[in-house]
């Protein structure tokens, strides 16, 4: 059994897999803070109860706030991989790369060649008038609901240095 204290989390997603065998019922993707993320990798784990984790796979390169979700319509595990230079640059700063696979642990092992550019913020995302910085896509998650995938875009409106100087969290907005 794995002790999760070995894996400090910057971002983490846990999904209950109703179609899996009992010993793989829960799936977790965890990305450590940048200072602790060896090779800019995350970890994927499985569990029978969501408390004790019995396996892990080191992922391919990914930025902090990378996550995963399950697409029940395609029966694929989707890795929403954040980049800020880890996989390549985007014209609008932080962006998302996409990786999908029918097997959770196998899909977690990727190279730059296995992922594709997915999306980023654009000129339709309005900047915060106080900072007037170009918005960036900080996170993107989704969930299957009835017959559609509902996505939630988290748009970053300022920068780390601004937030640190003001002694507050970064400003983000959630958009459907």
Predicted regions and their residues:
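Beta-rich carbohydrate-recognition and catalytic domains
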Residues: 1-138, 143-176
């Amino acid at each position: 059994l794995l002790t999760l204290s070995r894996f400090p989390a910057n971002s983490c997603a846990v999904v209950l897999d109703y179609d899996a065998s009992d010993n793989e019922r829960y799936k977790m993707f965890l990305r450590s803070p940048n200072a602790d993320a060896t090779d800019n990798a995350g970890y994927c784990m499985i569990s029978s109860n969501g408390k004790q984790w019995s396996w892990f796979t080191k992922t391919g390169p990914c930025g902090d706030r990378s996550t995963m979700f399950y697409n029940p319509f395609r029966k694929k595990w989707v890795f929403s991989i954040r980049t800020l230079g880890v996989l390549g640059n985007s014209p609008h700063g932080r962006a998302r790369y996409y990786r999908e696979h029918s097997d959770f642990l196998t899909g977690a092992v990727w190279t730059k060649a296995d992922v594709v550019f997915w999306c980023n913020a654009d000129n339709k995302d309005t900047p915060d008038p106080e900072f007037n910085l170009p918005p960036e896509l900080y996170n993107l998650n989704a969930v299957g609901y009835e017959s559609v995938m509902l996505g939630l875009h988290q748009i970053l409106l300022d920068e780390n240095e601004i937030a640190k100087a003001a002694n507050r969290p970064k400003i983000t907005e959630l958009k459907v």
